[in-house]
């Protein structure tokens, strides 16, 4: 990580399982009020942990009915890595746009650093997403450390940058 902030530890399979059944902090309907994304591009089903101005943990249930599985790949469906990154970015967007100083602004992707893919995401997997705010500058640029896990196993992690626009 290029920041001085250490990434949080990976969640154990047991902790991930507990979060999978935790009551939502933000439901799908509430997420729709926060994010501009809509089906088929809304990639956060619910937020199960939220610390204002710091971090969020969310879930994406990956089903065989996802539109991207039709072509990625026939007879061997794998969730595209760019959509895993997008899911992490959407969760990061929730953390940023809920900040009092930036309420009502739109968080746009501005950069990706150090993203690595560790294992494929398959139909039936539940992505456990985490987004941790590292920095925000001039109420215009935010940097997050984001991670995706399945069953306690690391799938993807990296730093995402956002530009906040009116």
Curated annotation (Swiss-Prot):
Keyword Acyltransferase annotated: no
GO biological process assignments: fatty acid biosynthetic process; lipid A biosynthetic process
Active site per UniProt: 72
Function: Involved in unsaturated fatty acids biosynthesis. Catalyzes the dehydration of short chain beta-hydroxyacyl-ACPs and long chain saturated and unsaturated beta-hydroxyacyl-ACPs.
Reactions the enzyme catalyzes: a (3R)-hydroxyacyl-[ACP] = a (2E)-enoyl-[ACP] + H2O
Lineage: Bacteria, Bacillati, Cyanobacteriota, Cyanophyceae, Synechococcales
The protein's Enzyme Commission number: 4.2.1.59
Protein name: 3-hydroxyacyl-[acyl-carrier-protein] dehydratase FabZ
Disulfide bonds: none
Family: Belongs to the thioester dehydratase family. FabZ subfamily.
MF terms (GO), sorted A to Z: (3R)-hydroxyacyl-[acyl-carrier-protein] dehydratase activity
Keywords of this entry: Cytoplasm, Lipid A biosynthesis, Lipid biosynthesis, Lipid metabolism, Lyase
Top EC class of this enzyme: lyase
Pfam family, one: FabA
Keyword Lipid metabolism found: yes
HAMAP family on file: FabZ
């Amino acid at each position: 990580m290029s920041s001085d902030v250490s990434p949080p530890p990976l969640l154990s399979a047991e902790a991930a399982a507990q979060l999978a059944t935790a009551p939502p902090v933000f439901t799908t309907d509430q997420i729709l009020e926060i994010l501009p994304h809509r089906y088929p591009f809304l990639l956060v089903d619910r937020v199960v942990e939220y610390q204002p101005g710091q971090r969020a943990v969310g879930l994406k249930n990956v089903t065989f009915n996802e539109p991207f599985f039709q072509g990625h790949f026939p007879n061997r469906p794998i969730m595209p890595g760019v959509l895993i990154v997008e899911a992490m970015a959407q969760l990061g967007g929730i953390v940023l746009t809920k900040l009092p100083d930036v309420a009502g602004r739109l968080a746009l992707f501005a950069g990706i650093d150090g993203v690595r893919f560790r294992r494929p995401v398959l139909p039936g997997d539940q992505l456990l997403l985490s987004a941790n705010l590292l920095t925000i500058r001039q109420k215009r640029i935010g940097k997050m450390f984001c991670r995706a896990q399945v069953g306690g196993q690391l799938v993807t992690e990296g730093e995402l940058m956002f530009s906040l626009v009116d």
